Amino acid sequence: METCSPPVTFITYALYGIKTSPAWTLPNFEQVICSCDWGYRLIAVGAESKCDVTPQGSFVIQHGASITALVLDCGVEFCSYAFTHAENTRVPLTTEDGSVLVVPFCGWVCVGRDRCLRSMSGGVLTISWDTSQTAYISVAVYRPPTLQCHALDCTRAETTVCSTAAITDASESDPLYADQEGDQTQDQDGGHDFLETILMESDLYGTNGASALLEPCFPCLSNND
């Protein structure tokens, strides 16, 4: 059996003061809407890490037959995720104290306020509920064959391709860089937003930190003019 390479990216949320609405359930589908008083988000990419405090807000978890989606809206901190399941087996989502949901995935999409990151990587999503009104959401992303990202201003998007060979042995090829002139979105403190942190501080796709601007994650956002 082929062994997996070590995880190269971790995204972890710790959300405190959780209040949950009654779960909405259908066959092979659950949805939970929650509010939180505060929390933090930690990103670890290789030897680099970044931690941000998240203010009061809300989040939604939708757990379906083939996709699990998360939407976190904490004011200036907004992001949504969609994970494509890697296995046919499915465990229902619950918010009972001490419950844990583990979802292996084979691809994921992450959308911020102004950019979208799409990866054909595999990994594991874990959602756990503590007994003290605390929720933990952890994403472990493994080395993917391809990473795709674009700024939602589609008129500025440019294209580059990261080959599997560059990922498996980046030292044998020159890194590929997209033109970053149109990719200047930053946090209010002058630092890069968390999606840019993932792109610039990792070698997920064998480019040693280049932002790869590819076709939109959602075709309806394309500018056809």
Swiss-Prot record:
One of its GO terms (cellular component) is host cell nucleus. It is found in: Host nucleus. Keywords: Host nucleus. Its main location: host cell. Belongs to the alphaherpesvirinae HHV-1 UL4 family. This is Nuclear protein UL4 homolog. It comes from Equine herpesvirus 1 (strain Ab4p) (EHV-1).
